From Swiss-Prot:
Protein name (Swiss-Prot/TrEMBL): Putative glycosyltransferase R655
PANTHER family from the UniProt entry: GLYCOSYLTRANSFERASE 25 FAMILY MEMBER (PTHR10730:SF53), PROCOLLAGEN-LYSINE,2-OXOGLUTARATE 5-DIOXYGENASE/GLYCOSYLTRANSFERASE 25 FAMILY MEMBER (PTHR10730)
Family: Belongs to the glycosyltransferase 25 family.
Coiled-coil annotated spans: none
Organism of provenance: Acanthamoeba polyphaga mimivirus
Enzyme Commission number: 2.-.-.-
Length: 324
C-alpha cells in the first residue's frame, strides 16, 4: 500500500487498546503505522485555550469524552494538512475491528480511488432500520469500489477513513471559521465537503454496533461535563473601538464560532464588515451608538462589540470617551 500512511488515534492511558491494535496489524502483516496521542477528555480543564473551538457548541460537546474525540480528529487533520506531498492517510480509532482480509481488500479499494475523492469512509454507523437493507452493499459487495456517501443511511462514525491534505485543510479551515458546534462526525457530514464510502465496508466498531451488551467506549460511557470558563478580554486593537457590554441588534453577516483574534482576522478580510461582537457575530451594519443594546458577559469577563474605527470616522460618529 504505497502512498498511504496509517494513523491510529489512541489515548495514552489506554495501553491495552494499543496492544490490541498492534496485534491486529501483526495478524494482517501491516508493519507501517503510527499511534497519535488522543486528547483525553478526562484531562481537559475549563481554562484550556483549545476549548475555544467549542464556543457556541451544542450541549453534547460539553461531555469530556465527546470533546476529546473531536479535538483528536481536529489535531490529526492539522498534522495531515501540513503534508502537501499527495500522500493519503488512513485514520483509525483504536476500538475498531478489521473485517476479514483487511490489508488485501484495502489495497483493492486504494486502486479505485479517483484524484477528486479526498475523503472516504471505509466504515460507518448505519441507521438501525437500514442495516438489513444495506447488507448487500456494505457487507456482501465484493467490488471494493468507491461511491458517494449514502447519506440516507449514514448515522455517524469517524472510526475509519482515508483522506489527504485537501480534505484535512478544508476541515481545519471550516473549524477556524465555524468552530466545532456539533459532534465531529456530523461536522464533516454537514460541512459541505464531498464525502465517499467504500463498498463494502472494511472496518467496524462495537462501540456503536452492538446488541445492548456493555462495550468498552471512552465516549459512549463518559458523561462528565466540561464547565467552560469565562476568560479575560485583554484585546485592544489600533483599528477598532471596543464598547464593553454593548451590541448592535441586526446587521449580521454571519455567526462565527471563534475567539476574538480569529473574529478580527475575519472582519479585517471582509470589506463589508464594519464590526463584530464577542458572541461571534460579524456585522455589515450597526445601529446609532445611542441605540446599542446591553449584553452580559457570556464568554469573556468583558463581552461587547468591536467597531472599525474607519467606519466610525466615515459615518462621522465621534464620541470623546472613545478617544477617536
Amino acid at each position: 500500500m504505497e502512498n498511504l500512511k496509517i494513523i491510529v488515534i489512541n489515548l495514552k492511558r489506554r495501553t491495552d487498546r494499543r496492544e490490541i491494535m498492534e496485534k491486529k496489524f501483526q495478524d494482517e502483516n501491516i508493519t507501517q503505522y503510527e499511534f497519535f496521542e488522543a486528547f483525553d477528555g478526562e484531562t481537559l480543564r475549563p481554562e484550556d485555550p483549545i476549548l475555544g473551538v467549542f464556543k457556541h457548541g451544542v450541549h453534547g460537546l460539553s461531555r469530556k469524552g465527546v470533546a476529546g474525540c473531536a479535538l483528536s480528529h481536529y489535531t490529526v487533520w492539522q498534522k495531515i494538512a501540513a503534508d502537501t506531498s499527495g500522500t493519503k492517510y488512513l485514520v483509525l480509532e483504536d476500538d475498531i475491528n478489521f473485517k476479514p482480509n483487511f490489508k488485501e481488500n484495502l489495497s483493492k479499494v486504494m486502486k479505485t480511488i479517483e484524484p477528486s475523492q479526498a475523503m472516504i469512509l471505509i466504515g460507518m454507523t448505519v441507521n438501525g432500520d437500514d442495516v438489513t437493507k444495506t447488507r448487500d452493499i456494505y457487507e456482501l459487495d465484493t467490488s471494493y469500489t468507491i461511491h458517494p456517501l449514502g447519506r440516507d443511511y449514514y448515522a455517524g462514525g469517524l472510526f475509519g477513513y482515508i483522506l489527504d491534505y485537501r480534505a484535512a485543510q478544508y476541515f481545519v479551515d471550516y473549524i477556524s471559521y465555524n468552530g466545532i458546534r456539533i459532534v465531529i462526525d456530523y461536522l464533516t457530514y454537514r460541512s459541505g465537503f464531498p464525502m465517499y464510502e467504500s463498498h463494502p465496508h472494511l472496518v467496524y466498531t462495537q462501540s456503536v454496533q452492538h446488541d445492548g451488551e456493555h462495550v468498552d467506549s471512552d465516549i459512549q460511557h463518559q458523561y462528565d461535563r466540561i464547565k467552560y470558563a469565562i476568560i479575560p478580554n485583554t484585546y485592544e486593537f489600533d483599528d477598532y473601538v471596543f464598547i464593553p457590554n454593548k451590541d448592535s441588534a441586526g446587521g449580521d453577516i454571519r455567526e462565527v464560532c471563534a475567539d476574538i483574534p480569529i473574529l478580527k482576522n475575519i472582519a479585517d478580510k471582509d470589506i463589508n464588515c464594519v464590526a463584530f461582537n464577542t458572541y461571534g457575530w460579524v456585522k455589515n451594519n450597526i445601529k446609532p451608538l445611542h441605540q446599542l443594546i446591553d449584553i452580559g458577559n457570556r464568554y469573556y469577563e468583558s463581552d461587547g462589540i468591536y467597531i472599525k474605527k474607519n467606519y466610525l470616522l466615515k459615518e462621522k460618529i465621534i464620541i470623546n470617551s472613545l478617544n477617536l
